[in-house]
Amino acid sequence: MDISRAEQRILHLLAQGGRIEIIRSETKKIEAASCFTRDGWLYPGFDLTLFRKLKHLKAIKSSGGHPYRITERGLRLVRAQLDNR
């Protein structure tokens, strides 16, 4: 299955140890989602529609009220990239 470039970037960040944190309204609906790198930096190219796409693909999952992390299916979807650290 092919995924978009934006989805690929987010999955790569999550595979390196990043996380997605959400903000819920009083009615328990998701209002906003933010993607953080493993170093704690906020990734600017992430929005609610991208979050919903990744959740629909079952590439991310949250358990026990913790931030969203990449799943094994998400790891299979992400292609290897050279990390220039």
Swiss-Prot record:
Recorded family membership: Belongs to the UPF0386 family.
InterPro entries reported for this sequence: YjhX_toxin (IPR018654)
Signal peptide (UniProt feature, chain positions): none
HAMAP family, A to Z: UPF0386 (MF_00827)
Highest taxon listed in the record's lineage: Bacteria
Protein known as: UPF0386 protein Arad_1912
Pfam families, sorted: YjhX_toxin (PF09857)
